[in-house]
Structure formats: structure tokens, C-alpha cells
Amino acid sequence: MNFSSFIFKVSDVFKSVIHEASDVVTKADLDNANAHTHSLAVGLGIGIVLFLIAGLIIGYFISMKIMKRQLKKNPPISKDTIRMIYQQVGRKPSESQINEIYNRAVKQK
């Protein structure tokens, strides 16, 4: 047995294996598998996008709730801050002026 006859035998074996494999897996099976894979990928893509949108919406409302709670506990302006601003400009405000400005600032939130 020489090398060329060995190559021919190996190629015949490969041909028979490929022929048997093609009998087992038909074109319809491949099309069905491709369609299933495609629909799975589309469904997964839509699911990811929907979960991202839902996460953004839920995150927005949670962050707004936390922000409002923080502003209520620690307002950005206090009566002492208003007093200090008036003193920096060289004025001595009355308590009613301070209360009026503070109440307007709190209502604007």
C-alpha cells in the first residue's frame, strides 16, 4: 500500500462519513434550528431592552423619592443662611423678613 492509495482510502472514508452526516441532518432541520435560534435571539434582545427601560423608570422614581426625603431633612437654605447673606450685604434683617424669605424658598421646592 503506497501513500496515494492510503489518501484515496481516507478520502473515501471521509466521503462516507459526510454522506451519513448529511442524511442525519437535513436542510429542513438546519432551517428549523436557525429559525429557532433567530427567534430566541430576538426574544432575548427584546427582553433585555424591556428590562433596561423598566430599570431606568424604577430607578428614576426611587432616586426622586430619596432626593425629596433628603431635601426635606436637610433643606438647601436655612434661616441662618439667610441671616448670613443679609449680613454680608451689610443689612440687619428683621425676623419677619427672614421668615418670609425662608417660607418662599421652602414653598418653591
Curated annotation (Swiss-Prot):
The answer to whether keyword Phosphoprotein applies is no
InterPro entries reported for this sequence: UPF0154
Where's it mainly located?
A: membrane
- Membrane-topology descriptor: Single-pass membrane protein
What domain of life is recorded for the organism?
A: Bacteria
Matching entries from Pfam families are given as: UPF0154 (PF03672)
This entry carries the following GO cellular component terms, namely: plasma membrane
**Keyword annotations:** Cell membrane, Membrane, Transmembrane, Transmembrane helix
Q: Which residues form the signal peptide?
A: none
Is the keyword Membrane in the record?
A: yes
Annotated membrane-spanning segments are 42-62
Question: Where is the protein localized?
Answer: Cell membrane
What family is this?
Belongs to the UPF0154 family.
HAMAP family attached to this UniProt entry: UPF0154 (MF_00363)
What is the recorded name of this protein?
Answer: UPF0154 protein UPA3_0273
Gene source species? Ureaplasma parvum serovar 3 (strain ATCC 27815 / 27 / NCTC 11736)
